């Protein structure tokens, strides 16, 4: 049976962690000096006027490299807990992790052979 008093610490932590950022924003809004002027209403207020067009079109190659990086980065995040408990889990989990690693590697080899990672 669920006993709600078991979660008192969780609810207290949730309420306190919600109140602290709200109080920080309220206090900074009250104590911050009001600085109004034409510089504050411009879209670029560092004092240097931007030159040229702000819209730049990126090459699709950047997105391909970013996508490959994100895939392997997320895979690393999932493999870290497995590596920390490798001695406890056994061989079956090792085979599952090996398959988990091989699937993105097959995708990387496919992208490499199709020329998706070529820079020229």
From Swiss-Prot:
Keyword Lipoprotein recorded: no
Keywords from the named record: Chloroplast, Membrane, NAD, NADP, Plastid, Plastoquinone, Quinone, Thylakoid, Translocase, Transmembrane, Transmembrane helix, Transport
Spans traversing the lipid bilayer: 9-29, 64-84, 88-108
Membrane topology: Multi-pass membrane protein
One Gene Ontology term of the molecular function aspect: NADH dehydrogenase (ubiquinone) activity
Catalytic activity: a plastoquinone + NADH + (n+1) H(+)(in) = a plastoquinol + NAD(+) + n H(+)(out); a plastoquinone + NADPH + (n+1) H(+)(in) = a plastoquinol + NADP(+) + n H(+)(out)
Keyword Transmembrane: yes
EC number per UniProt: 7.1.1.-
Protein localization: Plastid, Chloroplast thylakoid membrane
Task performed by this protein: NDH shuttles electrons from NAD(P)H:plastoquinone, via FMN and iron-sulfur (Fe-S) centers, to quinones in the photosynthetic chain and possibly in a chloroplast respiratory chain. The immediate electron acceptor for the enzyme in this species is believed to be plastoquinone. Couples the redox reaction to proton translocation, and thus conserves the redox energy in a proton gradient.
Annotated family: Belongs to the complex I subunit 3 family.
The name this protein goes by in its record: NAD(P)H-quinone oxidoreductase subunit 3, chloroplastic
